[in-house]
Amino acid sequence: KASEKKKTNVIALELPKGKIITGKQTDLLSPASSVIINAIKELSKIPDEINLLSPTILEPILKLRKNNNTLSLQEVLIALAVCSVTNPSIASALEKLEVLKDCEAQATYIVTNGDLKALKSLKINLTCEPNFYSKEIM
């Protein structure tokens, strides 16, 4: 039905002081990428309207990929690391990744293997709803 909303994959993350941060799938980012960017922006007190990574940085990376339509968390972390060399705000935000250790996160879908590995490497505890990320899997 036209009146039904399109289902969006989302991850919610509880920060150490209890604030809940969410990340949803966008045209460029996976939900895991979005939630981590949003979390480090919150911890760094970077306003929501400021992009840590410009779409002009992300789009060429995405064009190199043929089998997926969003950038994984690992790809976004690499892009942040590269950009941090010339951008002190990004460098400061990346330092906040350590604060996410042992935080709890909940996904509305089964997180893809690549994002799952990246979240585990950040030591984030994740639970998932039993819904596939993509209908192509079914």
Enumerate the predicted regions with their spans:
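Generic hydrophobic/packing signal
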Residues: 9-11, 42-43, 66-70
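Short beta-strand scaffold segments in enzyme catalytic cores
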Residues: 10-14, 18
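Generic structural signal for well-ordered beta-strand positions
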Residues: 21-22
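Short loop/turn hinge sites at secondary-structure boundaries
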Residues: 1, 45-46
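C-terminal binding/interaction regions
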Residues: 4-5, 48-138
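Short, basic/aromatic recognition patches
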Residues: 1-10
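A short, polar/charged loop-to-alpha-helix boundary motif
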Residues: 28-44
